[in-house]
Amino acid sequence: NNPNNPTGKIYSEEEIKGLAEILRENNSKTGRITYLICDEPYRAIVYDGAKVAPAFQFYENTVIVSSFAKDLSLPGERIGYVSVNPKSDNPDEFIKAVTFALRVLGCVNAPAFFQKVIAKSWDAKVDYSSYKTRRDKLMAVLDKAGIQYHRPEGAFYLFCKVPENFNGDDGDFCFHLKKHLILA
């Protein structure tokens, strides 16, 4: 996914191009199409001028999965979409397969009312600045505590390294935090 959950890393254009080349080589070698499925619900939540590379431009057999709930900052509203690159080898077949899978797996569609809300909100401008403010505050607290982390370039996650004195055991670290009512 891009930006990545849980690290907030944004994969660069070069990384996406490299992955596309590997997939093309695999397609040639196997005679089968491998799809690049990009889970991008956080693509609009980016920091410090970062941008999410447009995978459609680099690999024809790309599918984008995203979420209006994240795009429009509507937490809890489970409404999203799948977009198939029109340049892919067989976009209609892929769409049929996804539609079939949704029916067979019993996925529930978003209520009609909310589908209309999304249609009317398509061009809404969302202020994501609160995510950056929270990220920066949390990084300052972690810096002060001496806890290492991957600096998130996007999304609203911050992935920390378990402190040395816990020997890399995240379970022990979480239990320690819970004892001090830091983590529920």
Model region roles, listed by residue range:
Residues 1-184:
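PLP-dependent class I/II
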